[in-house]
Amino acid sequence: MPPTVNMGIPGASRTALGSVAGDVTGKRVLLAEPRGYCAGVDRAVETVERALEKHGAPIYVRHEIVHNRYVVDTLAKAGAIFVEQTDEVPEGAIVVFSAHGVAPTVHEEAAARHLRTIDATCPLVTKVHNEAKRFARDDYDILLVGHEGHEEVVGTAGEAPDHVQVVDNPDAVDKVTVRDPNKVIWLSQTTLSVDETMETVRRLREKFPTLQDPPSDDICYATQNRQVAVKAMAPECELVIVVGSKNSSNSVRLVEVALGAGASAAHLVDYADDIDPAWFDGVTTVGVTSGASVPEILVRGVLDRLAEHGYDVVQPVTTANETLVFALPREIRPARQ
């Protein structure tokens, strides 16, 4: 886990809120930091942008490059064509694989169609893929904690379909069976709620006491950091607004975390126009954060809308500083001078 992650929630809350618990008694906004783009999303979006610059339109992208409407619409206007399946891409064309990763069968399909591929899979997702392959080679049963049908889960499970079982939530544990309880390991989708994942793992361990942990934390640093920041500010908020799309797992989890941490209400919005003024009735403090696939321009739009309703004092709640940067895929890296 990168050193920017602060999982000590109580301490994080005191530190973060120490600077905002002053004499402000009127309407205010608590603005979570960190929020927005993570290193994997930044890399994926730049990958499509660079591919368009280098090769020109159209560039095909298998699935949404990241789960955000604004980002996808912006790239589509620039010449990206988003498809659901590889066979929708013309033979010989360029296709970018999304940040969520793909199964080996997708690479095989692309090769059969002579597609030129650029893999924008987040390196932290690739890490989970490699773990799945490693433990499948050792003939483990792999319990993949994640949301059934999510692109990332489909891709990871596809690395070892005969060894992976998806465990969607804590209640799904009762249905899990394994061949050898002494050779079972859990892995996870990178964008889950930390708390719900740990509850699922707790139940799995009750059923399989020798359950092994992944070699390193699978839930990504950015997912954890954003949840920590929301937990720090939510107890002070009557309302939390999470900027993000409905199909963004990590954004949806932030709404759940806010409610679980004490916010009276929490809502997910794509744009400022999605905000219902009725939400502000009786509200003094509004918390604002955004999912890991959300550009800052959308957060600024929400802050402007809040200011129109009198919430013009913005106070940061900082629980971590993120500096991680991932290298671009080699196919679109700038040539060395």
UniProtKB/Swiss-Prot annotation:
Keywords: 4Fe-4S, Iron, Iron-sulfur, Isoprene biosynthesis, Metal-binding, Oxidoreductase
Domain of life where this protein originates: Bacteria
EC number: 1.17.7.4
CDD domains, per database record: lytB_ispH
Residues that hold (2E)-4-hydroxy-3-methylbut-2-enyl diphosphate according to the record: H67, H100, H150, T190, S248, S249, N250, S293
Active site (catalytic residues): E152
Residues where [4Fe-4S] cluster binds: C38, C122, C220
Pfam families linked to this entry: LYTB (PF02401)
InterPro entries from the UniProt entry: LytB/IspH
Keyword 4Fe-4S annotated: yes
Function, in words: Catalyzes the conversion of 1-hydroxy-2-methyl-2-(E)-butenyl 4-diphosphate (HMBPP) into a mixture of isopentenyl diphosphate (IPP) and dimethylallyl diphosphate (DMAPP). Acts in the terminal step of the DOXP/MEP pathway for isoprenoid precursor biosynthesis.
Family membership: Belongs to the IspH family.
Protein's name according to its UniProt entry: 4-hydroxy-3-methylbut-2-enyl diphosphate reductase
Species this protein is from: Mycolicibacterium vanbaalenii (strain DSM 7251 / JCM 13017 / BCRC 16820 / KCTC 9966 / NRRL B-24157 / PYR-1) (Mycobacterium vanbaalenii)
